From Swiss-Prot:
Pfam families: Rogdi_lz. Widely expressed with highest levels in spinal cord, brain, heart and bone marrow. Also expressed in fetal brain and liver. It is found in: Nucleus envelope; Presynapse; Cell projection, Axon; Perikaryon. The gene is ROGDI. It comes from Homo sapiens (Human). One of its GO terms (biological process) is memory. This is Protein rogdi homolog. Its main location: nucleus. It is linked to Kohlschuetter-Toenz syndrome: An autosomal recessive disorder characterized by severe global developmental delay, early-onset intractable seizures, spasticity, and amelogenesis imperfecta affecting both primary and secondary teeth and causing yellow or brown discoloration of the teeth. Although the phenotype is consistent, there is variability. Intellectual disability is related to the severity of seizures, and the disorder can thus be considered an epileptic encephalopathy. Some infants show normal development until seizure onset, whereas others are delayed from birth.
Length: 287
């Protein structure tokens, strides 16, 4: 019995020593690794023109789709803003070519990119608030920090992977419709959003429903992408979507950022798992 108790005490001492090493050394090593990865992610969002200061450089992306050639164009991205859009639309019925572009004095902020960048900055702030000289006293303290960092990273990722669901009146009321010169025809709506690593542009063609129409008017709810036949009321008119054209372009640095988010979340979870393993060795929570 004495031998068993001695062995148990020895094992406990070893475990306690390992846990102290984890708190004092490995935790800080992981925090440093996370900081380095997230700083790389942050750089992807800023894309400075020279050095680390100055305006973000402009990048041109050609819009394309494997399903249609009705819409062609080029989008110019400058950091978190769309600084130019040059779009050609071939009308399905008469093959008339419409051209519209941003007014020179206008830029369209992509809120998804801005929000994702802010969440990354908040995660970095949380990590740097515990520098190398800081001594973690309990595992619970580490778990709390990891949970807070993971929350910011999950929010950053979700902003890029989950576009907002908008109603057609919300799209019609958006300032984006007033960005173009010449002004968009009244039977067109345009929406721009991020989906994963892609910048997507959707053009909706509309037609007015006659007051004596026998169609059962049912306003469409919110959606990322509305389908032909979706109806809505705008002003005194009832309108229906007749055609939908979606084109997109891949933004390579958004793909990089998503990879960094995934790797960082995995590192956080691995550290949480290591901390939690020690709780299984004691009937009480020593951390």
């Amino acid at each position: 019995m004495a031998t068993v108790m001695a062995a148990t005490a020895a094992e406990r001492a070893v475990l306690e020593e390992e846990f102290r090493w984890l708190l004092h050394d490995e935790v800080h090593a992981v925090l440093k690794q996370l900081q380095d990865i997230l700083k790389e992610a942050s750089l992807r969002f800023t894309l400075p023109g020279s050095g680390t200061e100055g305006p973000a450089k402009q990048e041109n992306f050609i819009l394309g789709s494997c399903g249609t050639d009705q819409v062609k164009g080029v989008l110019t991205l400058q950091g978190d803003a769309l600084s130019q859009a040059d779009v050609n639309l071939k009308m399905p019925r008469n093959n008339q070519l419409l051209h519209f572009a941003f007014r020179e004095d206008k830029q369209w902020k992509l809120q998804q990119i801005q929000d994702a960048r802010n969440h990354v900055s908040q995660a970095i702030y949380l990590l740097t608030s515990r520098d190398q000289s800081y001594q973690f006293k309990t595992g619970a303290e580490v778990l709390k920090l990891m949970d807070a960092v993971m929350l910011q990273l999950t929010r950053a990722r979700n902003r890029l992977t989950t576009p907002a669901t908008l109603t057609l009146p919300e799209i019609a009321a958006s300032g984006l419709t007033r960005m173009f010169a010449p002004a968009l025809p009244s039977d067109l709506l345009v929406n721009v959003y991020i989906n994963l690593n892609k910048l997507c542009l959707t053009v909706y063609q509309l037609h007015a429903l006659q007051p004596n129409s026998t169609k059962n008017f049912r306003p469409a709810g919110g959606a990322v992408l509305h389908s032909p036949g979706a109806m809505f009321e705008w002003g005194s008119q009832r309108l229906e979507v007749s055609h939908v054209h979606k084109v997109e372009c891949v933004i390579p640095w958004l793909n990089d950022a998503l990879v960094y988010f995934t790797v960082s979340l995995q590192l956080c979870q691995q550290l949480k798992d290591k901390i939690s393993v020690f709780s299984s060795y004691w009937s009480y929570r020593p951390f």
